[in-house]
Structures are given as structure tokens and as C-alpha cells.
Amino acid sequence: MNARLEGLGITPQVLLDVFDTPVSFHRCLVPVTGGVTSALMLSQAIWTTQSLEPCADGWFIRSQEQWTQETGLSRWEQETARRALRRSGLLEERRVGMPARLWFRVRPDAVWRALQAHAGASYR
């Protein structure tokens, strides 16, 4: 590591503590979803779906706070991304229970069709 940074007390461990856990997403979803924010949210939803039991039928619960913790997206960024994903048919939502909790489900068939359409348009 740079001696100047170490002289300031900035060690690799300090950087890891400050930077926290990185957030990744599937870049191929950016043109399909219309932006990085929506691509990040859809990527996180796809990742979450992979660990579900078959009986869940693809549905999972996420609170606004959980989305923020997992992705770093603010409430307004989440709402904008969710709206875009719903409109494009890539993500379904439903409210269930009292008090109502928000459930999500990725539509893999719609994601696949959107990826194919984008790939086809890229090679024309």
C-alpha cells in the first residue's frame, strides 16, 4: 500500500471497513430496464428469488428498509425503479395481510423476452 496513505492511518482494513460490502448488478439489465437504478433493483430481486423455496411460487417480501440495506437505494429511487419494472412487466407486486406487507415476484419469462429483444436490436 502507498506509504503516504499508511502514514495517514489509512490501511487496507480501514478501507474495507469504510467501503462496506459492494453492491453488484447485472449490467445487461440496464438497457432492458431503462437505467442503472431499475437494473440494480431487478438484479437484487433475481438474486433473492434464487434462494426461495419452490412453494413460494417466486414471491418474496422486502421492506423499504431491507431494499435500502441491500442496494443502497433511497425510498424515492426504489419507488421510481419499482414503477418502471412494473410498467415493463418485469416485476409483479402485491400487498397482503393486515397490516399490509409488500410482496414481489420477478417475471423470468418477461425478463428473458426483454433480453432477447434487446440482443436482437443490438445486432441489426
Name the predicted role of every residue range.
Residues 1-66:
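Short recognition helix of helix-turn-helix/winged-helix DNA-binding domains
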Residues 44, 96, 107-109:
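Generic beta-structure capping elements
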Residues 49-105:
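Winged helix-turn-helix DNA-binding recognition segment
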Residues 27-32, 90, 108-116:
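Short alpha-helical interface patches
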Residues 19-24, 99-107:
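Short, exposed beta-strand "edge-strand" segments with a Pro/Gly-rich flavor and a Y/T-containing core
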Residues 18, 35, 93, 116-123:
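Long, compositionally biased, intrinsically disordered segments
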Residues 1-14, 108-124:
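Charged low-complexity intrinsically disordered patches
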